[in-house]
Amino acid sequence: ACAEYLKRLKPMVSLEMVEIAEESLGGGESPALIRRALEREGEKILKRIGGRAAVVPLALEGRQLDSLAFAGELDPGKNLSREQLVFIIGSSHGLSPQVYQRADWRLSFGPMTFPHQLARVMLLEQIYRAEMILARRSYHK
């Protein structure tokens, strides 16, 4: 499904999907190990982001938007700079505080937790839907 939305988006936007491997916890799940792993992941993520990028991590406490409002957030004439727009899906333990501090705003798909693969498809579909809305083409119903 990701490949299909990437193919559909290719004529509309320049899009790159980058995956950063989840850090190993070394056999434990203590809060300290999780915090250190998130810090290491966060450093890797932040190194990949340009200084002028608009950053939007997915987070449970983020803004829940309908498709029209999401399209409005992606509208280059109204809100975020589209020089580089970076959406971030965290690891199974979330994201580091440093990544959240770098965020321009946070997006939420609701209080449920989704596997990374499904969240990725949902995000790509919503980006595609937003681009269709902004182009005033029929897709969004």
What is the role of each PLM region?
Residues 3, 42, 97-100:
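Short, surface-exposed alpha-helical segments at coil->helix boundaries
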Residues 1, 69-70, 99, 119:
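Residues at alpha-helix caps and immediate loop-helix transition turns in enzyme cores, especially N-
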Residues 1-14, 21:
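Glycine-rich, flexible N-terminal cofactor/catalytic loop recognition
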